[in-house]
């Protein structure tokens, strides 16, 4: 594989694969009895929650994603994830300016296939401590390696390696904000009602140093009926915008059913519509077999404190009586 194609891989990874693997939003403790922080994404009460998604790009299926949580002896979580993208059209996810520089490679490789694996370590207080992801082009030695850690004083250290390129940065993470981006699918969002609003500070250590943070404004606006698991389900629609007004289309949207499960997440990237459509719990249970031998891919990464064997997962429904994921809520 030519070196320019590695650049394509990095760009594609930045827009899609790491949007899934590079974690989502930090939650405050929602209410007594609710898992704290990041744990609220992956547990239902005391039960870990496997979640699977079908990935759609411009209304075409291009892959699937899976996450599976495992509780540790100290009350924390290890979350393993897998993402597969098949025949992904490069011209729909790479910026036009980048296509100018990789035109010949793009003509020879109009679509790429990627497989990504990820791990996260979350402590008993719901704080993210480590994240690792590895993106591989099947049948090649080309890969993208991303890893990071967050210390007790909120210092974030992130490193990225791909195609002989190495990038590393460390920054201070403000309290009660998100790390990653709003494009990552969120499994649960309980406690919604029409008109509810809140703000979500988005912080990414990979963004330019002069502007590492952005504020998004979320609002529950309207309802829509979706077909899910052979049933018609009425969902609340959550819109995310860069400002308070509704003069521009939302940057991303979520469809949330009454029990708090997110059934669909949609965002627009470079004019292309990216959707994560939730799979039924039974499908997620079946897909969890993809994580067998998952940790063997991370022999070059620092170890995570986790048991060697994955537990049997529960598909207990989510009860939604708590507040949505947010840093600031306006009642």
Model-derived features: where do they sit?
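Beta-strand/loop-rich accessory regions of lumenal/periplasmic or secreted enzymes
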Residues: 172-199
